[in-house]
Design a protein with these regions (language model features):
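Glycine-rich phosphate-binding P-loop
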Residues: 229
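Glycine-rich phosphate/diphosphate-binding loop of Rossmann-like nucleotide-binding domains
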Residues: 210-212, 218-226
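N-terminal accessory targeting/assembly segments
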Residues: 1-215
């Protein structure tokens, strides 16, 4: 594994070269609190963006062990962190300039569902986040200075704010974990009682449209008294 300083040196050495020289960056680099991996480099600035991942060890992230003690909590924590990371990278996407997809920073977009995704994975060693970056260029000439901004200015802030426990709302995360555990309990009870669904009082069932999972504005909330008398 190489250091972040070596990555900077490599960026300086390929600046203004033709775009394929970016492929020499593929590999893993040790930053202060995480490992940055350049897993796949796009062929040109107009192609699908490059694949990047970061690994933050648990000792750096600082999340309580009970938040990733089993599959349910790991999926819930990973989903929560993906949403936090998406919020952060959205502040910086396309702030680095260039042609085509230059400066793009994107994460898999989450819907309302809490699902297991490749965008974030909780392992025994730490947290792995996977995302996409458009490597900057002017035409098809490398603009390494703009990529340096992404890797050394934007990304460290995003990682610090999204994946370090002390920088997040502990209460919000705790409530998210509790909600997931409550949902898992209800699902098990449905099976035991041979039921197909549980609808809570006050639930909004109609959706905004056939392609939206958002609740319809102004709709009547569910009441079991109105249904069953």
């Amino acid at each position: 594994m190489q250091s972040s300083n070596q990555l900077q040196d490599m960026l300086h050495s390929i600046n203004r070269k033709s775009y394929p020289a970016y492929k020499s960056l593929k590999g893993a680099y040790q930053f202060n609190k995480y490992v940055l991996s350049i897993d796949h480099v796009q062929g040109d600035p107009f192609a699908s963006p490059s694949h990047i991942s970061v690994k933050i060890f648990h000792r750096e992230a600082g999340f309580p062990a009970e938040y990733y003690k089993d599959k349910l909590t790991r999926i819930t924590l990973a989903d929560y962190l993906t949403r936090q990371f998406e919020q952060q990278v959205n502040r910086y996407t396309f702030r680095a300039k260039g042609s085509g997809k230059s400066g793009l920073i994107s994460v898999t977009r989450c819907g309302q569902e809490v699902l297991e995704r490749t965008a974030c994975e909780i392992t025994e060693q730490g947290i792995i986040a996977r995302f996409f970056v458009g490597f900057p260029a002017n035409g098809r000439t490398i603009n390494a200075g703009e990529l340096e901004k992404i890797f050394f200015e934007f990304l460290p802030v995003c990682v610090e704010k999204a994946f370090v426990y002390r920088n997040l709302s502990g209460k919000d995360l705790e409530n998210t974990i509790f909600l997931a555990e409550d949902q898992a309990y209800i699902r098990e009870e449905l099976k035991k009682r041979s039921l197909v669904a549980f609808v809570n009082d006050g639930a909004i069932l109609p959706r905004e449209s056939g392609i939206s999972s958002k609740p319809m504005k102004g709709s009547v909330t569910f009441s079991r008294r109105k249904v069953f008398g």
